[in-house]
């Protein structure tokens, strides 16, 4: 079967939920037996989001093969079974960087390098390459139609539609249909103008997804269809819902998947969304609730911890519990004290970079350890737990990470200086290395030690989890810390790097160097988060008595 392409654009305003809409459509098509993948094209000039501020851009999602990508790829993986890779996300910066590299190498034989055709050709080549072997490729373009930054991408997709044939392509445009309370009606004019903007660059949308806080009335849908030159059945009303996992059924109920299959002349069975119905049932019928404190550095923007937030919700679904997340700035722990942690059922310390707020995180780990509160540390959350234990239990009173104190006399956490990359080449790092693309990234095997809590939680001897870090446990000082009672429960495949630590005489204290949140999904959850939330409920129950 030849590959079919769905191009997703947004208009009127940003943050309409293009990624969620694209992922929801993909999940329906996948449920119809189609081989689907999703790509995200980001117009910013950064090569990737790896060095962008989490409080501006949100989290960096890491793929199996180690790509640092937009958080929308996390949505994609949570909605469909297909895994994302480096091919599923690229930016203007990456495109320009590659074109300039080819120009320096002489690939263009002295031609004058221009946006058209060189930049647009590079975009088209990457879209085609990323979609090889798929029945349907959904391509989301970041930003809003009318933005200068998006123009090369939109032009490339317009050309691609001509190249592969309009019968193999479909343009899906998300717009805002606002409700004006004083008029008592929704307004379609912004949608009409957004489509007009698309038409001005040569793109006629085939489907309109109309975002609103309420269902779009039939007469307004007819009006949109008439003035935007699309069939009425292709005007889809997408109202605000209480759960993003309700959107696949909402789109299916309006026949969007049928319209797509008809357009591409695909003969495939009806979608079975029973798994999503189970997710929604568990979400709507909890048997209790727990409150988990997330002590982080970027809590002013919850999207900085998007995958962690979702993984906690998934663990709630697994345990039939509502998970309430209380965000606490680790700097506030330093100034206001651990009283901010009172009343929590469990504590989670997520990843982060830099010294700011670290002592607050260390005090948080100490509070959880001393008060027997369930604790889950992720990445930096593991490193600070190790530092705390080394200082206050193992007698290494000057313990720290070389990330925070280069002259630390007891560096229990240090820079990884050498390892093999995915090609088998030895890579070397130093304090002077670039920040971008210089971490241990992607899926790595981890060996779990027999008789540990981690082994019990996972129920397996070997697991695969994704990493994003450049600092690791210093094995030189590890024996003294282990002698004081800390247990290493997970090691890298070569048994050289510490991946998981735990405290045996604590009800539930586990910290991992990797990022388990990146592989959690609403349908399957994740064992580490499921065990953590179950421990939170057990702690809550024991303190009610």
UniProtKB/Swiss-Prot annotation:
Keyword Nucleotide-binding recorded: yes
Protein's name in the database: CTP synthase
Organism listed in the record: Actinobacillus pleuropneumoniae serotype 5b (strain L20)
More info: CTPSs have evolved a hybrid strategy for distinguishing between UTP and CTP. The overlapping regions of the product feedback inhibitory and substrate sites recognize a common feature in both compounds, the triphosphate moiety. To differentiate isosteric substrate and product pyrimidine rings, an additional pocket far from the expected kinase/ligase catalytic site, specifically recognizes the cytosine and ribose portions of the product inhibitor.
Pathway: Pyrimidine metabolism; CTP biosynthesis via de novo pathway; CTP from UDP: step 2/2
UniProt keyword annotations, A-Z: ATP-binding, Glutamine amidotransferase, Ligase, Magnesium, Metal-binding, Nucleotide-binding, Pyrimidine biosynthesis
Role, per record: Catalyzes the ATP-dependent amination of UTP to CTP with either L-glutamine or ammonia as the source of nitrogen. Regulates intracellular CTP levels through interactions with the four ribonucleotide triphosphates.
Record: residues binding CTP: 14, 147-149, 187-192, 223
Stretches assigned to coiled coil: none
Domain of life according to the entry: Bacteria
InterPro entries reported for this sequence: Class_I_gatase-like, CTP_synthase, CTP_synthase_N, GATASE, GATase1_CTP_Synthase, P-loop_NTPase
């Amino acid at each position: 079967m030849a590959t079919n392409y769905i191009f997703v654009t947004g208009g009127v305003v940003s943050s309409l939920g293009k990624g969620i809409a694209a992922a929801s459509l993909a999940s329906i098509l996948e449920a119809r037996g189609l081989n689907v993948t999703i790509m995200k094209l980001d117009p910013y000039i950064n090569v990737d989001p790896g060095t962008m501020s989490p409080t501006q851009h949100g989290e960096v999602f890491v793929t199996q093969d180690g790509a640092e990508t937009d958080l929308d790829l996390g949505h994609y993986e949570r909605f469909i079974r297909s895994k994302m890779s480096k091919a599923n996300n690229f930016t203007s910066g990456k495109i320009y960087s590659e074109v300039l590299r080819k120009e320096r190498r002489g690939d263009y034989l002295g031609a004058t390098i221009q946006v058209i055709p060189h930049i647009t050709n590079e975009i088209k080549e990457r879209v085609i390459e990323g979609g090889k072997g798929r029945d349907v490729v959904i391509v989301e373009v970041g930003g809003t139609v009318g933005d200068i930054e998006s123009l090369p991408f939109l032009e490339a997709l317009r050309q691609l539609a001509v190249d592969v044939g309009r019968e193999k392509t479909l343009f899906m445009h998300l717009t805002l249909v606002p409700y004006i309370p004083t008029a008592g009606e929704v307004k379609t004019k912004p949608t009409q103008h957004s489509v007009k903007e698309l038409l001005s660059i040569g793109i006629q949308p085939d489907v309109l997804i109309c975002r609103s806080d309420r269902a779009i009335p039939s007469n307004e849908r007819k009006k949109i269809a008439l003035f935007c030159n699309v069939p009425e059945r292709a005007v889809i009303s997408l109202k605000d819902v209480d759960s993003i996992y309700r959107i696949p059924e909402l789109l299916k109920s309006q026949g969007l998947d049928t319209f797509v299959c008809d357009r591409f002349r695909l003969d495939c069975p009806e979608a079975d969304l029973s798994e999503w119905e189970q997710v929604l049932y568990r979400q709507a019928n909890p048997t209790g609730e727990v409150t988990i404190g997330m002590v982080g550095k970027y809590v002013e923007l919850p999207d900085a911890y998007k995958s962690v937030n979702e993984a906690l919700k998934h663990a709630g679904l697994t345990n039939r519990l509502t998970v309430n997340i209380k965000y606490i700035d680790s700097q506030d722990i330093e100034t206001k004290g651990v009283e901010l942690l009172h009343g929590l059922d469990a504590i989670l310390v997520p990843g982060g970079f830099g010294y700011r707020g670290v002592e607050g995180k260390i005090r948080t780990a100490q509070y959880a350890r001393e008060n027997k509160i369930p604790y889950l540390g992720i990445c930096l959350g593991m490193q600070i737990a190790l530092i705390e234990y080394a200082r206050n239990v193992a007698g290494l009173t000057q313990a720290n990470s070389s990330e925070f104190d280069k002259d630390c006399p007891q560096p229990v956490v240090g820079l990884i200086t050498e390892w093999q990359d995915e090609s088998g080449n030895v890579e070397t790092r130093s304090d002077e290395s670039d920040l971008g693309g210089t971490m241990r990234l992607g899926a790595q095997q981890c060996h779990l030690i027999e008789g540990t809590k981690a082994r019990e939680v996972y129920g397996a001897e070997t697991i695969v989890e994704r990493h994003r870090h450049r600092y690791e446990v210093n094995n030189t000082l590890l024996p003294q810390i282990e002698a004081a009672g800390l247990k290493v429960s997970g090691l890298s495949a070569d048994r050289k790097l510490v991946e998981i630590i735990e405290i045996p005489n604590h009800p539930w204290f586990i910290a991992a160097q990797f990022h388990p949140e990146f592989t959690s999904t609403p349908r399957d959850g994740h064992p580490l988060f499921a065990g953590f939330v179950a421990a939170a409920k057990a702690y809550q129950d024991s303190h009610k008595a």
